[in-house]
């Protein structure tokens, strides 16, 4: 991030140490996934049925099949913020940017117990290539390969 006349300006997106979360933990029936870090968040909407517990790779485009939002907040945000039907009054969203382009790839693979061979879970690795976001100054921020992360679902 860079400072410009007292305003925070986004130069790159980094959520490397943030887990992917949903309001229905470890469930494939989700319509959005999110990750947050202090006063910022990424919010990805996904089509119904795209997460399945079977090995496959799916792709889609932003803003057609998927939507991605980058948000900053007036104060530290918690996971409970995202699961409310109506967002709470605090913290306030201070900046909201909807991505205007990008390709979302979700690679799903089963994870097995190394000793017994029993199926443990499914990992859904989500990457976004050629992501385009508008910054507060109106300029574009382009991330050629954003690793959104791995969302895990139960084996059922």
Q: What role is predicted for each listed range?
A:
Residues 25-30, 127:
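A short, compositionally biased
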Residues 8, 51, 62, 103-104, ...:
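Compositionally biased, intrinsically disordered low-complexity regions
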Residues 3, 44, 104-106, 128, ...:
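Generic structural hydrophobic/aromatic packing signal, biased to beta-strands
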Residues 124-156:
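Edge beta-strand at a domain terminus
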Residues 1-26:
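Bacterial Sec-dependent N-terminal signal peptides
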Residues 29-121:
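Surface-exposed helix/loop patches within compact recognition domains
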